[in-house]
């Protein structure tokens, strides 16, 4: 099972809580996190893009770095770990993204890939005059399909002449092309999103569900498997979980309850308002899950709470779901959490024995 880290490009990571660690994003913080991930043998890091936050008492995600420039910097200071940036496709033309990706491929010596997002929060784009109107909610993946076609043509052949509804390319050129095959991630959970992923992407990212229910996401993966059956492509699912661990189950649970007690209701209200703006994409989108009030404190991602041994066992259960390639992890405290994961959780995981074995061999 592959394991990656969803690095905190926005302030406070993924906890909307006054009781959680409060911090600003910086290159130095994300460099430390990425180097720790590499040190502990993790496989990749991914940075999101967020152009406007949720406000509230914690100013949640009101402060963000930019994904491509951050990953370019990280590419220059790492040697093994794979790096994924996120492209806000309403802001950046595909030919520019293709060239930026090729550049970071060069910096990283072939360790770069791309996450594509359509955009679901109107104020992120309206503030720049780039929101195409609410009818876009229902056509996001038609737009993204043309976008991905341009990317693939440029990366694979160095040229695109695509004439579509959204993009018209005229002898568009790209050189140098990436030295390694450029992998595409998509996190769309709607039917249209699944169809796009099965057609154009290499990995599907989905939310875990519930607290200490590591296989509850299985129906999402099954839906992707159905979409893949129509395209015949090899696409695996990666699942997002928050890890809250401590020496004992009781200590970890106490932290989780403390975070929940400080939930930022104002920030969550903003999230709910923005989620309700999309009336066209159906009930199965990521934003529908994020805006559910059940576990507002961490936008309803799957959460693994317990001792190091408990979390290790729960993570080993994740990979038992057919079609699952790995997990994407976030932590309440990234630096301590990563060290605890690398030294106290990962060595207990059956699904990561190959990594611990390699690390022991390197030491020897």
Swiss-Prot record:
Pfam families: Bac_luciferase. Belongs to the NtaA/SnaA/DszA monooxygenase family. RutA subfamily. Keywords: Flavoprotein, FMN, Monooxygenase, NADP, Oxidoreductase. Its EC number is 1.14.99.46. GO terms for biological process: alkanesulfonate catabolic process; nitrogen utilization; uracil catabolic process. The FMN-N(5)-oxide reacts spontaneously with NADH to produce FMN. Requires the flavin reductase RutF to regenerate FMN in vivo. It catalyses: uracil + FMNH2 + NADH + O2 = (Z)-3-ureidoacrylate + FMN + NAD(+) + H2O + H(+); thymine + FMNH2 + NADH + O2 = (Z)-2-methylureidoacrylate + FMN + NAD(+) + H2O + H(+). NCBIfam families: RutA. InterPro entries: Luciferase-like_dom, Luciferase-like_sf, Pyrimidine_monooxygenase_RutA, SsuD_RutA_monooxygenase. GO terms for molecular function: alkanesulfonate monooxygenase activity; uracil oxygenase activity. It comes from Methylorubrum extorquens (strain ATCC 14718 / DSM 1338 / JCM 2805 / NCIMB 9133 / AM1). It comes from the Bacteria. FMN binds at residues 49-50, 115, 124, 140-141, 190. This is Pyrimidine monooxygenase RutA. CDD domains: Alkanesulfonate_monoxygenase (cd01094).
């Amino acid at each position: 099972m592959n394991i990656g880290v969803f690095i905190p490009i926005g302030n406070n990571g993924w906890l909307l809580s006054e009781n959680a660690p409060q911090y600003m994003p910086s290159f130095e913080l994300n460099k430390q996190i990425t180097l720790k991930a590499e040190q502990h043998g993790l496989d990749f890091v991914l940075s999101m893009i967020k152009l406007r936050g949720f406000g509230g008492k914690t100013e949640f995600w009101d402060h963000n770095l930019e994904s491509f420039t951050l990953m370019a910097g990280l590419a220059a200071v790492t040697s093994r770990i794979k790096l994924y940036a996120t492209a806000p496709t309403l802001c950046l033309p595909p030919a520019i993204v293709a060239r930026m990706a090729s550049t970071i491929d060069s910096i990283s010596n072939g360790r770069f890939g791309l996450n594509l997002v359509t955009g679901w929060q109107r104020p992120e784009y309206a503030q720049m005059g780039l929101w195409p109107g609410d009818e876009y909610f229902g056509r996001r993946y038609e737009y993204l399909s043309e976008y991905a076609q341009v990317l693939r043509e440029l990366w694979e052949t160095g040229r695109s002449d695509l004439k579509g509804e959204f993009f018209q390319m005229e002898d568009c050129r790209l050189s140098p092309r990436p030295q390694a095959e450029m992998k595409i991630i998509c996190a769309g959970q709607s039917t249209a999103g699944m169809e796009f992923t099965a057609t154009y992407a290499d990995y599907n990212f989905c939310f875990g569900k519930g607290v200490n229910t590591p296989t509850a996401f299985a129906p999402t993966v099954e839906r992707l498997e159905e979409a893949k059956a129509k395209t015949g492509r090899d696409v695996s699912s990666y699942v997002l979980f928050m890890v809250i661990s401590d020496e004992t189950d009781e200590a970890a649970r106490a932290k989780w309850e403390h975070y929940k007690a400080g939930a930022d209701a104002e920030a969550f209200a903003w999230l709910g308002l923005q989620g309700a703006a999309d009336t066209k994409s159906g009930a199965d989108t990521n934003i529908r899950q994020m805006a559910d009030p059940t576990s507002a404190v961490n936008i309803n991602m799957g959460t693994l709470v317990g001792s190091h041994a408990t979390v290790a066992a729960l993570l080993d259960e994740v990979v038992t779901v057919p079609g699952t390639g790995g997990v994407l992890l976030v932590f309440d405290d990234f630096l301590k959490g990563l060290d605890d994961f690398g030294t106290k959780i990962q060595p207990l995981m059956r699904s990561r024995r190959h990594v611990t074995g390699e690390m022991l061999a390197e030491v020897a």
